[in-house]
Amino acid sequence: MRILISNDDGVTAPGIAALHAALVDYAECAVIAPDQDKSGASSSLTLDRPLHPQTLANGFISLNGTPTDCVHLGLNGLLPQTPDMVVSGINLGANLGDDVLYSGTVAAALEGRFLGGTSLAFSLLSRQPDNLPTAAYIARRLVEAQSRLVLPPRTVLNVNIPNLPLEHIRGIQLTRLGHRARAAAPTKVVNPRGKEGYWIAVAGDAEDGGPGTDFHAVMQGYVSITPLQLDRTFNDAFEQLDGWLEGLL
C-alpha cells in the first residue's frame, strides 16, 4: 500500500506530522504539502509560475503551491511510484457543510479521486493540537479499513472529528453536508500609510445543522463521515428549468 499525504495547513503543521506518524508503519507514505498555510485554496492549481519541490530533513516534500498542486504532482510523476490512495489532513479546524467548497484539505483528497483506493480528508474541530492523538487514531483505523470498502468511482470521504479525548468519542455517524448561514461582513483595516484593506470574516454558523448533518454529529460527540462526489448537478431543478427555457429559442 502506497499513500500520498497532503494538507492545506502547510508542510510543517502538526496535523500532517501526526497523520504521517499514525500511518507510516502501516503503508509506504509520501508527504507532499504546501510550503505555507494554504487554507481556503480549494481546488486551485498554480498555472502562472513553475513549482519547485524541496525535500526537507524529515523526508517530507515542500512545494511552493496549493494542496491540489501537491497531489497533482504526486500522482503525475513526482513520486517514483503512483500512490494507491490520498489521505489529507489532519486539518486544525472544521470542514463542515459549505466549508468543503473552500477547503484545501478536502480539495487535496478530491484530487486523488482517480485512484483505486478511496481518498479521505481528516479535520479536527479545533485550532489547537491537544486532541490530535484522537484524530490520528481514528485516521489510522479508517485507513486500515479502507481495503474492504467498495464505493462508486470518484467518491471521497470527508471526516470531521470532535475536539475530544478518544475515550469521550461516542462513535461514528454517516452524515450529509449541512449548510452554514452567510458569513459576517469583511473587516475593514487601514495601514499606517492610509491604505485600505479587508480581512475575510469567519464562516457563518450552522443554518442547517439538524439530525443527519455533519454539524449535528460532531456536536453530539460523534465522528462525522460524509461521502462526497464532484458532480454537483441539482437534478431536482430540471423540471422547473425545462418550463423556464421553453420557447426562449
UniProtKB/Swiss-Prot annotation:
Enzyme class: hydrolase
UniProt-recorded Gene Ontology molecular function terms: 3'-nucleotidase activity; 5'-nucleotidase activity; exopolyphosphatase activity; metal ion binding; nucleotide binding
UniProt-listed Enzyme Commission number(s): 3.1.3.5
GO cellular component, one term: cytoplasm
Keyword Hydrolase attached: yes
Keywords: Cytoplasm, Hydrolase, Metal-binding, Nucleotide-binding
Membrane-spanning segments: none
Organism: Pseudomonas putida (strain ATCC 700007 / DSM 6899 / JCM 31910 / BCRC 17059 / LMG 24140 / F1)
The organism's place on the tree of life at top rank: Bacteria
Pfam families, A to Z: SurE
Catalytic activity: a ribonucleoside 5'-phosphate + H2O = a ribonucleoside + phosphate
Entries under Gene3D superfamilies matching the protein: Survival protein SurE-like phosphatase/nucleotidase (3.40.1210.10)
Family, similarity comment: Belongs to the SurE nucleotidase family.
Role description: Nucleotidase that shows phosphatase activity on nucleoside 5'-monophosphates.
Protein name: 5'-nucleotidase SurE
Binding site for a divalent metal cation: D8, D9, S39, N91
InterPro entries membership: SurE, SurE-like_Pase/nucleotidase, SurE-like_sf
Location of the protein in the cell: Cytoplasm
